[in-house]
């Protein structure tokens, strides 16, 4: 689902995360630029059964993106436009919450290669 983005004080920063992020629906577009917040996911148990255990390096594989990759690569999924939550951006948040980040191109490539490698291994393991 979509979400509004609010600041520490509860003031609206963005009315729509999906619009702010220019979110894409396709699998490969999301590998290029992950477009959704994990706190807005709803998924069936069978996806979690495949996703767990998460790949070991949590800096190169966030659980949000991992669950999305498992779901999008092997199952059908739907994005609903309703804003079901307001996502609060704290100054110390780990994720950027859709805002620009300063990670290097090297890190972005390493991150995606790590995710795809583990995704391929998992798909072979579960014969997906």
Predicted features and spans:
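Short, flexible, mixed-charge acidic loops at enzyme active sites
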Residues: 12-20
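Catalytic core of nucleotide-sugar-dependent glycosyltransferases
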Residues: 19-31, 87-91, 96-128
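Hydrophobic alpha-helical membrane context
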Residues: 14, 76, 100-102
């Amino acid at each position: 689902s979509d979400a509004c983005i609010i600041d520490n004080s509860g003031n609206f920063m963005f009315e729509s995360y999906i619009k702010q992020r220019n979110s894409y629906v396709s699998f490969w577009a999301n590998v290029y630029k992950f477009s959704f917040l994990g706190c807005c996911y709803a998924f069936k148990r069978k996806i979690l059964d495949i996703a767990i255990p998460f790949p070991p390096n949590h800096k190169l594989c966030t659980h949000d993106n991992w669950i999305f990759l498992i779901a999008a690569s092997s199952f059908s999924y739907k994005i609903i436009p309703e804003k079901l939550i307001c996502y609060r951006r704290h100054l110390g948040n780990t994720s950027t919450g859709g805002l620009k980040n300063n990670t290097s191109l090297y890190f972005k490539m390493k991150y995606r290669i790590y995710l795809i490698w583990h995704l391929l291994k998992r798909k072979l393991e579960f014969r997906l």
